[in-house]
């Protein structure tokens, strides 16, 4: 049974997906292809073939493949290079001759004949590879490509938000492609319809329609509402009654039912839409039409007599005379169009034009300043919207257009069609008539996610297009008789474009690697910023706000607190992104009122019409919904519906939150703002050297630990054959399929944020493991569960003012036991260059440096691993040649002795900067190719090769032992067919006899079934050679040289581990947004203690709870207190040997956890007791989000632990020993240490001066300071601190003479010294003299009087 099992208060019905699947799947589709359309092969196929433009040659794409990376992931980090693989493509150059082949319609040759074909595999560049954890390693640094939320391609309808003078909204439509020109339609205040291309000058829509080839008759058919009037036998005209046409109309004639002759409404009545629909429902289908109404209407079709004669052409406006002649004309029907409401037709009437005029006008708008022709205008118009090379809607854009307008075009059609434009114009006209609704741009059905694969597709396409232009240029000057494809390719272009994206794009970000949670959150982040996205300065409230479609897709809690709030979000834990880029969330099918286990994913568009109930709906044992009426969501509104109409159910109550928010127990009891802070602060928690999983968790801790990639997980089931501090070897037990998996543990590896990545083995040799079992814990992980902090005994108590305003009081026990001690790795780099005066040199012999600063260096001048270093110590000794100086007598002597000039060098060593001290844990030496390796580099290389050999030997030993055990089974019990002492021919082979023979000679024994033994031996040899080959390749990589920058000979990297203990000024927090700074570390004997003498670990201010409204921390404290004391109770019973009580207590604790009870019932008493030993530190519980324990369950556990159900305890003051006046809330709470450490912030500059008259700026990193300025002087004046003020202005400023005097006084032990004149005062004096003002010091009273008289005279008094 697993050692770590939480007490659950709910059931997990749907397992969690891979939490970084979004990144992995997107990149896999780019590299390997898929149904997304973004793949390397698709891009090659879209750009190639490339023709030279003269029909002489064509370069075609055949296929491509990705090679293997040169180094593994960690090797690239060590060397500071990109983790990438070479891309090679097979290109075919087809050269055409002068003659042609093939025949046209008249027997004339049409196609050029192929003269020559040359194929070649060409290196196209290096493509960055995604690591197994979903990151990229660029120049040795792990980076994450954040997914981007942007507006989906397709059509959008909106209004201008500002009403016109008439009070009417003007509506707009916009067709946005993924790539290509935008097409906008808009109304002006006079209801004239215009269009724009790429937001340029607008034109009436008539020009677009004419350019699309529409005549007036076509426009009538497409956009106008035609009323067909028929002549009855009694000579009256009837028209079809359409309720929408009569909306808001005041009748100009009596409304009479043409079928019954009944008067429905009298003339002058106004018809509302409701009344019109009621009349239609009562049977009104046709009504009589007054001839007077036909006046000012237009003919939608030619008015043709019954004999076929055209009496009036279409488009004719009916006048009073025309209407009067209707009854005399030989017609039985007429199609009419009313100008009111037919905005397209009215625009055509106002701004009519011909086809040629339309084309030329559009050309002038798109390309102003050029002289157009009709042919060039036609080509331009065709390329704007109907050419796949310049216009692309993607499959998602086509699907959205099809869904919006009920079209049936194929997904592969990714350009606009005429029908798309017609439907857009018709829909916009309906909106202007206030029929229909505008689109909500914040609806997730209108926004899609672009992931890393799509970004790579765009960059790759840009690179290939640039390469194609270069190919065309090279073809122009190429000799096609001899040229090969590789001579026309510049492979640097593609790599440069991709490199530019990873290095400069706002969406390629330095990975947040503080802890495993911060990593996984960064990979699941979705940003609305970046290229093609929003600008945080202009983004309004609506786009930042929570939307109803975010339910189950985007977390409503987790987002940054600053200027990007609402623009950067996180995926909900169950959400995934489909092939079109839309976010989907899972639901369980509900059939006939029964909630099934069948799960489907729905996008925001799919679930609009669905009836979806909550995961907490009450069901019976068979899954049938109990209640007759169920609270559901339909069209994003909450309604009660019958259970038979329910279609889907949420899979879990926690599906609406992100990974970080799902780790907060009792999240439902916290204010949203504090939950946001809690989510963000968990990502800032520093991994501790002794991590501890929370007693009160949510059940998500294990999933996050696995999904982060920080732990080592067994790939296959097997047996652990070998373990040490760095390696784990697992082998199979199968006789048919034998394999060996070797795992290497990370040791003291530096993260992006200088935290320590260190893995610890959690299995033992001989242990059987299943696929997916945890083999090694990583940073901030314990027993396979995320462990960001520690469980502490907390008291909510105001204590002597030390926890005022969120300050935190800590017991010295916490510091003494290193509960919150963390290790941080600082990396320092020393670069050895080849200068113009000669190469720099690594050496221990650095002149002018005291031996005490060189103590950690080895004989080669590089710090030893394991050395303790302090600020100012030399990590790498290095000297640099200096320029020549005048020859001294000593130098003359050296030249005379050695016959050459002695090298003049200066110290350029790498020193440990101020404020840093620790232990050297690793040294890396990288050397340029072609340079002989120095001693330390050879030593490091030998250590690495020895480590690889040790791993190889372990694998070979496991393989050998396994194979010989199988061979032994085959031989024992069989009759020998040959003699091999001590076994004779005909003897029965026994184990004892085999033990006397060397194992290598067992293969020589001949028995029946020798073919199977030969097969076993062949398998053994093949596997043996495979292992050796793998490690030989590793040896070559280790021995290989490094590619360094130009002029760099060597790079030495030294990593120093710095231990940070908890101290006042460090920032701590809980998981509920409750943060504070440590104000004091109190001796354990002075801290408040419980009745049994147990001192509390931490004291928090109770006033921090009610105003912040994060009551979840109180519930966590109570439940943690119960869990902690249950562990103490179990421990006491175990120590007493009362095992029956232990079993009863364990069964009572888990009685409401059905899965755990089922497992406990299968265990024996001894196994239950053994399991209970793992509960000594407390019973871990899972308070899932929205499904945690209720108050009565917490009280039950408190009573079971023997504690007051109120959760309060009697506390005694540790200083006085007196009992506090009332009971205090005491419990066990999970606390985190955040990376805002006081050691990284507090900085004191107590040495040295600065440049005269300038400020000592530069900050902590340069050991700088800040000026004691004017306002600071005022403060000292206000306090009357005259001597301190004088010191600040003189010897502590820029009084050079005074500083020398102070130094002399300190050396003599004298307290008296004299101040000098500050240099800044001398500067002021010289500036006054430059203004012809002479300033002198005077001490004589007479001189003062003289100066006073002069001043009075100058003022005229």
UniProtKB/Swiss-Prot annotation:
A GO biological process held by the record: DNA-templated transcription
One MF annotation (Gene Ontology) recorded for this entry: DNA binding
Group of enzyme by EC: transferase
A Pfam family per the record: RNA_pol_Rpb2_1
GO cellular component terms attached to this protein's record: DNA-directed RNA polymerase complex
HAMAP family, per the entry: RNApol_bact_RpoB
Protein name in the entry: DNA-directed RNA polymerase subunit beta
Source taxonomy: Bacteria, Pseudomonadati, Pseudomonadota, Alphaproteobacteria, Rickettsiales
